[in-house]
């Protein structure tokens, strides 16, 4: 496999875009979900630990102590909020609490402790793509989990899935030896605070979109859209107010492919990107973007970008539940749709990226630490020419960004890279970057990285294929792919239905109480033995036989 030059950020190996955290051992996993001593005292008073048969845990003989405590705490919290079903004593009510905030506010309020300086990575006014899939399993289970406000329990399958994702990512975006050596030997501390890590995410996403053309693949690519909570529809412009909610996700796999495979006497030729063509006029953003825009008609006729999602399995088989498969497809459709929206108008996307950064609590005008700028140039020389332009006060060729400096007076605080001159003595570093260790006419801010990322989204959007893929992996082996087509109407309807739930415009819609569903969906649910919806359905089925028999006798 061709290993792409777009590398993983060596300074953030512990966190891929703040989502794919790698847990090495089950002990560490338990530590993340370990319950406090105070909570443990509360739990010991629960009926679940007093031999109350109505609170028996699902498959309790197979659960660890930590998992049992985790479930018990959730049930305790939900019972306090939802109360018991008045028509089914001992079981949980399955209607949204009328006197309590709607699901979105519950999901959102956990993020209200940001200090305004970006020191909290949680995002206000946001949903993830997976949060739109409320009916993937059972919406009632989803609602209980939301209102319990309890962190996700990371079981073995989640941990192994993250490891598979990391391995796939490193295969395409390895940490280069040159960058490892640079970071190890660099004499100036490279900042890794939340703000600089966020900027790193923007830079890394641009590099991954470039890697589509360098080597034909990219993994772990960020995308987003804004959902109007009033109408349940996605907008294609800038958010107007707090009612437009950020929905974000990370795409597992993008691949650039020929529309028609090339066959020679030795068989089909392997496609490894368009590195020679795209970079023939120089390895810098402006020339690359200009080439892609100038050749877009040719590219559309010959190539397409496929969007895929990776699903890891504990067995060599795909999911059997129809709703799980349906909403897994929706997930990929959302990703593809978001990329399409992001590519429509680069100036709008630029504004959205800035808005997204603001929602994370970051100052979009904050200057990037000079050591981080050197690190970015060492990571990929594609930005070196842009850094020269900013240093010299020249435009980079993207008007929405360049206009910030048009007719402006010198900034109150000079952006001075010369402060590193006395700290850097390595002759190799001075030879490569000495020209930048001077006062700059324009500062490097988050806005620059948002600008180039917006342009890259615009370059790939026209190439998006209607054909999408679910990739199934077992122990690192891609044993099955499911191909399907993009359907915009389906995800528009799905987003509308999900938003009605999140913003409290409809009640919870539990899974259909068929015999098959009660077995395949409910068996391993944390709430299986306190769920009134399930208990009523089960009881009705038990009574159905005698009722039919009685009718027959009459």
Swiss-Prot record:
Its EC number is 3.1.-.-. It holds the Pfam family Exo5. One of its GO terms (molecular function) is 4 iron, 4 sulfur cluster binding. One of its GO terms (cellular component) is nucleus. InterPro entries: EXOV. Its cofactor is Mg(2+); [4Fe-4S] cluster. [4Fe-4S] cluster binds at residues 138, 522, 525, 531. The keyword Iron-sulfur applies. It comes from the Eukaryota. Binds 1 [4Fe-4S] cluster. Its main location: mitochondrion. GO terms for biological process: interstrand cross-link repair; mitochondrial genome maintenance. Coiled coil: none annotated. Belongs to the EXO5 family. This is Exonuclease V, mitochondrial. It comes from Vanderwaltozyma polyspora (strain ATCC 22028 / DSM 70294 / BCRC 21397 / CBS 2163 / NBRC 10782 / NRRL Y-8283 / UCD 57-17).
């Amino acid at each position: 496999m061709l290993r792409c030059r777009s590398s993983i950020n060596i300074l953030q190996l512990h966190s891929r875009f703040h989502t794919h955290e790698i847990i090495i051992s089950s002990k560490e996993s338990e530590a993340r979900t370990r319950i406090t001593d105070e909570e443990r005292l509360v739990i010991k008073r629960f009926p679940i630990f007093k031999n109350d048969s109505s609170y028996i845990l699902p498959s309790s003989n197979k659960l660890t102590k930590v998992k049992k405590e985790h479930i018990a705490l959730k049930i305790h919290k939900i019972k306090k909020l939802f109360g018991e079903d008045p028509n089914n004593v001992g079981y949980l009510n399955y209607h949204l609490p009328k006197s309590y905030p709607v699901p979105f506010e519950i999901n959102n309020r956990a993020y209200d402790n940001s200090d305004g300086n970006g020191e909290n990575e949680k995002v206000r006014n946001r949903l993830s793509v997976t949060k739109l899939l409320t009916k993937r399993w059972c919406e009632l289970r989803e609602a209980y989990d939301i209102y319990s406000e309890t962190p996700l329990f990371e079981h073995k399958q989640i941990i192994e899935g993250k490891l598979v994702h990391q391995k796939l990512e490193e295969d395409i975006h390895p940490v280069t030896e040159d960058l490892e050596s640079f970071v190890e030997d660099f004499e100036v501390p490279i900042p890794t605070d939340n703000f600089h890590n966020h900027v790193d995410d923007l830079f890394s996403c641009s590099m991954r979109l470039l890697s589509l053309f360098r080597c034909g693949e990219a993994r772990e690519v960020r995308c987003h859209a804004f959902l109007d909570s009033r109408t349940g529809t996605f907008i294609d412009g800038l958010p107007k107010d707090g009612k437009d909610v950020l929905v974000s996700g990370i795409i597992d796999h993008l691949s650039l492919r020929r529309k028609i495979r090339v066959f020679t006497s030795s068989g089909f030729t392997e496609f490894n990107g368009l590195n020679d063509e795209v970079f023939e006029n120089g390895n810098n953003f402006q020339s690359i973007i200009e080439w892609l825009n100038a050749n877009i008609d040719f590219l559309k006729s010959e190539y397409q970008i496929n969007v895929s999602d990776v699903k890891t399995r504990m067995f060599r088989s795909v999911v059997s539940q129809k709703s799980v498969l349906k909403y897994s497809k929706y997930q990929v459709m959302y990703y593809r749709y978001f990329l399409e929206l992001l590519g429509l108008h680069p100036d709008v996307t630029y504004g959205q990226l800035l808005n997204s950064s603001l929602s994370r609590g970051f100052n979009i005008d904050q200057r990037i630490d000079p050591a981080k700028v050197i690190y970015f140039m060492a990571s990929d020389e594609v930005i070196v020419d842009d850094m020269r332009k900013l240093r010299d006060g020249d435009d980079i060729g993207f008007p929405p960004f360049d206009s910030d400096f048009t007719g402006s007076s010198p900034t109150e605080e000079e952006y001075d890279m010369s402060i590193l001159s006395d700290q850097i003595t390595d002759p190799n570093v001075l030879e490569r970057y000495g020209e930048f260790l001077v006062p700059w006419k324009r500062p490097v801010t988050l806005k620059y990285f948002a600008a180039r990322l917006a342009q890259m989204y615009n370059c790939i959007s026209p190439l998006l294929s209607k054909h999408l893929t679910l990739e199934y992996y077992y122990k690192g082996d891609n044993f099955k792919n499911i191909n399907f087509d993009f359907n915009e109407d389906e995800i528009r309807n799905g987003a509308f239905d999900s938003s009605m739930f999140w913003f409290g415009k409809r009640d919870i819609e539990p899974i259909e109480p068929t015999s098959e569903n009660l077995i395949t969906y409910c068996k391993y649910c944390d709430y299986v033995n306190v769920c009134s919806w399930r208990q009523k359905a089960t009881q009705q089925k038990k009574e159905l036989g005698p009722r039919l028999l009685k009718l027959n006798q009459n």
